């Protein structure tokens, strides 16, 4: 386990320590030898002839036994030095925290404030601030170098293997290279096809990249509500989610202590954190959408920019003219943010202030390099409503807004549905690429059927794998509690593992050069009956081992050449190994008692001659075979 600070004063508690048979290793980019890019190395059975396998690691220092974990102090603010050495920023006092930031919570319900305080920074003047601006200027930042090294997962330049994987896949027009270089990262960001969500105030961040020419990423949602959860639970859920592979986390808190909860999460988050600012703005006006104002919303944006939120979901595509298009839907408007803005538009009979003030929002977000996640407030909430005019009208508007944000220097990704049956998924990806200039797509699922409450992690995992294959850059997880309640810790893990499967399956299908290395390693371990390696190479070693041990719990069973499904006599892999062993002895006279070692080859040659003598045809008359056999 990690070295812990004083456990009596550490609040909240989080899960630490490495995953089974794993250790933290670091890769150093040639272009920046001062950077240490984390990987997880899975240690395989000694003597098995298998090298240890490096895999992508999202867990931050929480799985590094050498690191002191103190959630009260937060993670090291390493990236601030990178930001400052580039220049073009100023440090300032920042906005004063107000009672309404935490829902005017009383002292008896107030959460403990995060003690460490850091002055925020912001961009000044016309010098590049955002990763997009640096990329367009031809400047490769440390963040770009970092993510390039990270995407290669510690591989050396195994060009032949990489090219074979690319050839085997179907990428639907993606431009995945055999190897990721910092220059390739820069060019993808400059074109708007990828983003590195990295607020300059989130100095604890380990940068990552989102784009269809990179590994498919997943997001996990956490957050309190008016009825349940606490700061402690949400920080623990964040750490738990990244332990199992969440690439980003969205804090969707809607209850008390929103500002404080977010501060605790950000200061302890090595991954990008996203939010939906309209949720907190609504809390500041007593939950009444009609009372929302542009000034209140803008103040909330400033608050969250200064804290270090990396990307905002902003439902600026929910326009007054589109609301009537949802009238005949089965499930209407299901997005919380979308319904809030729809009610505001109808109550005031005005165009959305998110749409009319969009350029001002861009100017503000640019100063902090906060990325847009343009929200799909009119997404379908049932397969009956999939691909309707309301959904696609909003998507077309998001394409217009993308162009505005790019001109302002802001990074952009686009949110997508929702509930879409399998045969209607690809058109969503194709239309998004066309309308939004290939900006990264980020979808919730989509759920492919509506008949499985309690199993929507599966209904959506199917759609997620498909749309990831078609080109979606990031998949937002769905847990078993979707439509039913707030997910707990176990639900978070189930959702993350489900979506890691979907993301990995899509990478395999696209032909990502590094994707199949882990599959092949696990397959070899399975055939060799290296049970421990099978467990440890899987996405969830604990569950795999627990399932195996339900019926074969003894340590001796972990070297047995069978499992409880087939038993020792009917194991297909054991039988195959026996056949291979037997075949290997056929040319050994001592093993099978043959008069000489060439007997097997002579027999094969005789049968080959017979085939050619009969005309070399696969199918022949039965009588001719009988006559031929008489001659033998």
UniProtKB/Swiss-Prot annotation:
Binding positions for [4Fe-4S] cluster per the UniProt entry: 563, 566, 571
EC number(s) recorded for this UniProt protein: 4.1.99.17
Disordered: region residues: 1-26
GO biological process, one term: thiamine biosynthetic process
Cofactor(s) listed: [4Fe-4S] cluster
UniProt feature, compositional bias: Polar residues: 1-13
Keyword annotations from UniProtKB, A to Z: 4Fe-4S, Iron, Iron-sulfur, Lyase, Metal-binding, S-adenosyl-L-methionine, Thiamine biosynthesis, Zinc
Catalysis performed (reactions): 5-amino-1-(5-phospho-beta-D-ribosyl)imidazole + S-adenosyl-L-methionine = 4-amino-2-methyl-5-(phosphooxymethyl)pyrimidine + CO + 5'-deoxyadenosine + formate + L-methionine + 3 H(+)
NCBIfam families, A to Z: PRK09284.1, PRK13352.1, thiC
Name recorded for this polypeptide: Phosphomethylpyrimidine synthase
Annotated source species: Afipia carboxidovorans (strain ATCC 49405 / DSM 1227 / KCTC 32145 / OM5) (Oligotropha carboxidovorans)
Gene expressing this chain: thiC
